[in-house]
Structure formats: structure tokens, C-alpha cells
């Protein structure tokens, strides 16, 4: 069976679903989204943090992984005895800041649009993000952050111990204070993916779940479509690679070139529903904690270079719980 589309999107996570939804606003395009399982598998395991500043200045699991890998490579190059300074944050380029802040600014309007036009609520919450300070090393880390973002001084504020306790009564009394990022908020990651997907469906996008892309149709350097395991052939003018951890594999099929994308294992802890304990998202040098609108508390995240391994391991889970 051959199907013909203007655009085929390979991948139904939050990126693929977002692309599908935004393209579906154009009524002149015939669009298909293909996903190997139900959409949003990895997206559902994320914290849902819209941490435009936090992720850019060395907080959050992505940058934690970068620091971990940088330390490993430095030790490999210079010897296992080398000391890697953990008090200096890895500040991402200004272009990343700008991209993240502009993206964040779209969410209030997007939240309203998906609720009003498509009946989908992805639980956008203006929670802020607090980096909790326990010792001199934490404070030094926070001071490095502030020193590197003078253009965003209006988006951060220092909280002393009394202000932190007033803002977050459940935080340990050992905490000395916090650095708060005022524009960093959160959403429900699986609801966001579902909202994009349902909005795209209502706008006419054809959805193909539990469908694997097994090959790419090519004529020289030109991509003509994809082959799938159970839905036949899709001809398309444009193929969009939104395959997440499998993006490198799809890139080779389409271009003979691999892109530097690899899976990173992340373990999290999700509690049962609890009374409201947190007023905002918290992060430390060891973990981050976010309470969702339904009362569940998410504690994350390990960042492990273990490929597609999805098993849970007690030492890592215990470490997250202890850190929280």
C-alpha cells in the first residue's frame, strides 16, 4: 500500500508532535506522523521543566551529563588523578539562551490556544525554579552563574534562609538559601505531547502508531519517502527526522551521514499523590524535585551512558531518594 503526503514526520515524541501541530495550522499541507510505539515514550519520562535559564547555566540533567562526560574525557586525557572543578558551571552559548527564552515566551499563548481550540490542557504552571544552597561550594556555583548572565539579572533573585523557608516550608532547615530563576516554569510532559498530538489530529494530520520506519526511499541524494513495517510505503516531498534517540539511525538511512545523537539513560523516582509540599521546582547539585498538579512528586535524574538500557537499579534510585 502506497500513501502520499507533503510531509512525513518520523517520531511522535514532544518534538515530532509539536512539529505536526504547528505544520497542521497550514491547511494546504497533507501530513503524516509515524511513531514506533504510542507517542511520547521518552517525553513521558521527563520532568516537564521549562527551565530556560536553569538548563542554560549548568542545572538540569542535560548539562549534568555534559559535565560528567567532560570530566571523564579530561581524566582519560590527563590521568585518573586529575581534579575536575565542580564549582564552575558550564554556561551554554548566548544563542542557546536566546532560543530557550523565546521558546519559553510562547508557552502561555500555546497553553491557551490548545485549551480553547482543542480542549487539551497540558498544565502550564508558573512555578519558578530554585537552586537550593547548602554550603560554600553551592554558593560559589550560584555566584558563578549570576556573574555569567548579567543581561538576565532581572530574571534571578537571591533568597536568604528566611525567605527560602517562607517560600518553601518543606525544604530542609540545613539549606542556607537559594538562587531563584523567575521565568523557569513547568508543564506536564505527557499532557503536552498528548495536547500537540490531539491538536494535530483535529487539524487533519494522519497518525500512525506502533509503526516502525524500516527504510528510506531515495533517488540519489533526494529523499522520496519511507518504508514501514506494517503500513506500507509513504511517499513524501519532505521527511522530518524527529526520531529522538534513533535520529542517528534514521539519518544514515536518509543521507548516509550519522549525526551525533545517542541515547542517555535517565532514572527517576515518582511518588504517589501527596498533599501540596512544594510551591515551585527545586534543584540542587545532586537532583531536581518537581511536584505536579496531581500531587505526584518527581525526583530526577540520573544521567548514564548506557544506551537503550531501561532497567531500574537500586543504587541509583536510592541515591536520588537520599539526595531529595
Predicted regions and their residues:
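N-terminal Rossmann-like FAD-binding beta1-loop-alpha1 element of flavoenzymes
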Residues: 5-32
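Helix N-cap at the beta1-alpha1 junction of Rossmann-like dinucleotide-binding domains, i.e.
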Residues: 38-39
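General beta-strand structural signal in soluble alpha/beta enzymes
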Residues: 157-160, 208-209, 241
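Short beta-strand "acidic-cap" motif of Rossmann-like dinucleotide-binding folds
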Residues: 30-35, 158
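Dinucleotide-binding Rossmann-like beta1-alpha1 core, especially the glycine-rich loop
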Residues: 49-163
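Active-site substrate-recognition segment that forms the wall
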Residues: 18-25, 42, 48-55, 63-88, ...
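Helical element adjacent to the flavin cofactor pocket in flavoenzyme catalytic cores
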Residues: 178-238, 246-249
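Helix-loop-beta segment of a Rossmann-like dinucleotide-binding subdomain
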Residues: 92-93, 120-133, 142-203, 224, ...
Amino acid at each position: 500500500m502506497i500513501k502520499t503526503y507533503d510531509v512525513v514526520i518520523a517520531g511522535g515524541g514532544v518534538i515530532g508532535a509539536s512539529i505536526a501541530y504547528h505544520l497542521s495550522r497550514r491547511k494546504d499541507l497533507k501530513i503524516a506522523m509515524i511513531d514506533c510505539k504510542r507517542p511520547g515514550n521518552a517525553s513521558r519520562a521527563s520532568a516537564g521543566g521549562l527551565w530556560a535559564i536553569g538548563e542554560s547555566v549548568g542545572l538540569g540533567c542535560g548539562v549534568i551529563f555534559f559535565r560528567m562526560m567532560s570530566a571523564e574525557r579530561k581524566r582519560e586525557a590527563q590521568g585518573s588523578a586529575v581534579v575536575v572543578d565542580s564549582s564552575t558551571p558550564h554556561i551554554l552559548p548566548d544563542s542557546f539562551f536566546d532560543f530557550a527564552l523565546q521558546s519559553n515566551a510562547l508557552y502561555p499563548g500555546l497553553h491557551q490556544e490548545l485549551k480553547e481550540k482543542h480542549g487539551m490542557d497540558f498544565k502550564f504552571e508558573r512555578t519558578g525554579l530554585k537552586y537550593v544552597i547548602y554550603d560554600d561550594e553551592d554558593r560559589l556555583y550560584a555566584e558563578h552563574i549570576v556573574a555569567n548572565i548579567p543581561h538576565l539579572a532581572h530574571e534571578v533573585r537571591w533568597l536568604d534562609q528566611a525567605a527560602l523557608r517562607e517560600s518553601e516550608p518543606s525544604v530542609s532547615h540545613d539549606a542556607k538559601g537559594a538562587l531563584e530563576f523567575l521565568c523557569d516554569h513547568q508543564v506536564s510532559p505527557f499532557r503536552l505531547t498528548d495536547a500537540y498530538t490531539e491538536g494535530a489530529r483535529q487539524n487533519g494530520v494522519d497518525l500512525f502508531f506502533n509503526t516502525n520506519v524500516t527504510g528510506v526511499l531515495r533517488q540519489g541524494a533526494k529523499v522520496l519517502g519511507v518504508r514501514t513495517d506494517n503500513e506500507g510505503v509513504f511517499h513524501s516531498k519532505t521527511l522530518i527526522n524527529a526520531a529522538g534517540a534513533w535520529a542517528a539511525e534514521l539519518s544514515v538511512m536518509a543521507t548516509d551521514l550519522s549525526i551525533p545523537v545517542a541515547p542517555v539513560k535517565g532514572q527517576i523516582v515518582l511518588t504517589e499523590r501527596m498533599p501540596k509540599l512544594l510551591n515551585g521546582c527545586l534543584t540542587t547539585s545532586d537532583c531536581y524535585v518537581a511536584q505536579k498538579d496531581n500531587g505526584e512528586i518527581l525526583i530526577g535524574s540520573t544521567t548514564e551512558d548506557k544506551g537503550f538500557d531501561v532497567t531500574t537499579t537500586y543504587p541509583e534510585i536510592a541515591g536520588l531518594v537520599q539526595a531529595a
